[in-house]
Regions:
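Conserved alpha/beta-hydrolase catalytic His-Asp/Glu region
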Residues: 38-43, 56-117
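Short beta-strand/loop motif that positions the catalytic acidic residue
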Residues: 118, 124-126, 130
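Core-facing hydrophobic residues within beta-strands of well-ordered domains
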Residues: 23-25, 145-148, 156
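Conserved alpha/beta-hydrolase "acid-adjacent" motif
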Residues: 131-137
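Flexible "cap/lid" loop of the alpha/beta hydrolase fold
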Residues: 14-19, 23-58
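Alpha/beta-hydrolase fold nucleophile elbow
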Residues: 1-7
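Active-site loop->helix "elbow" adjoining a glycine-rich segment at hydrolase catalytic centers
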Residues: 7-10, 20
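Catalytic histidine-centered segment of alpha/beta-hydrolase-like enzymes
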Residues: 153-166
Length: 167
């Protein structure tokens, strides 16, 4: 199969590549979690201070969170911010638990030393201004995965497929 994922989905893709190498033809990673680069991200610094910068407490926080995720502001109409907030509020406890588990797994149990076991050709796509997972992870991935190449987009944050879909 061909697999790809962004952020946590990229971590799942990478884990799949390690666990089922015989089933994988190729992989695309977009700003994936699961490795530690030379530099800490703004999210890691906030998390070390006990803060979750992705947490939403009001519809206005949706705007702040999206500005943290994307390099250029995303325009989301007020009614959609309200819906986004309401969905987040329903699942706040679970989302917070997932966030802290990812922070722990991403920094406490990184896959850096297993990357050489990835056999599938891998394309690494990253936004230079990712505040969630530092762009220094690109070098770790490209150096660690034997058949990998990377593309780093300028003026893009954590979601290159949304911020620069034609890239």
């Amino acid at each position: 199969c061909h697999i790809g994922g962004n952020s946590m989905g990229g971590f799942v893709s990478l884990r799949f590549a390690l666990d089922y190498p015989e089933r994988l033809i190729s992989m695309t990673l977009f700003n994936n979690a699961g490795v530690v680069g030379a530099n800490e991200s703004k999210l890691q610094i906030e998390a070390q201070a006990g803060k979750n910068p992705l947490e939403i407490h009001s519809p206005d926080d949706v705007k702040r969170m999206l500005a943290f995720v994307a390099h250029k502001p995303m325009k989301i109409p007020g009614q959609f911010r309200k819906i986004f907030y309401e969905d987040f509020a329903v699942h706040r406890e679970l989302l917070d638990k997932i966030f802290w588990n990812l922070v722990e797994d991403g920094t406490g149990k990184p896959l850096n030393d297993q990357l050489d076991q990835v056999k599938a050709p891998t394309l690494i796509i990253w936004g230079r201004h990712d505040q969630l997972i530092d762009v220094s992870c690109v070098n770790v991935l490209e150096d660690g995965i034997p058949n990998a190449e990377s593309v780093v987009f300028e003026d893009v944050g954590h979601v290159p497929m949304i911020e620069n879909p034609k890239g």
